[in-house]
């Protein structure tokens, strides 16, 4: 299992699009921090502050030398994960 410390997935448990991303993470053997927007109000506030909306899933990518990237849309997130982690 690979733990990607630069990634965090903003989600909620019953969201089908979030499930799609979590399933892809499992298939790729990648662990990321899961931030449930309804389980912790700080996560919801961070998401709204960054994107202006609370739509999930969103993958927060923390770049070493630059601003964080907030990637939305489950298909785009899965494509990013496959490109980065597929063997």
Task: Cite the ranges covered by each PLM segment.
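GST-like domain detector, emphasizing the conserved glutathione-binding G-site
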Residues: 2-13, 19-87
């Amino acid at each position: 299992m690979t733990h990607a410390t630069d990634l965090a997935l903003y989600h909620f448990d019953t969201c089908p699009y979030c499930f799609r991303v979590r399933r892809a993470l499992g298939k790729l053997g990648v662990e990321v921090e899961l931030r449930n927007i309804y389980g912790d109000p700080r996560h919801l506030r961070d998401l709204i502050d960054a994107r202006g909306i609370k739509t999930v899933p969103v993958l927060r990518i923390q770049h070493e030398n630059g601003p964080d990237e907030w990637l939305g849309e489950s298909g785009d997130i899965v494509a990013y994960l496959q490109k980065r982690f597929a063997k």
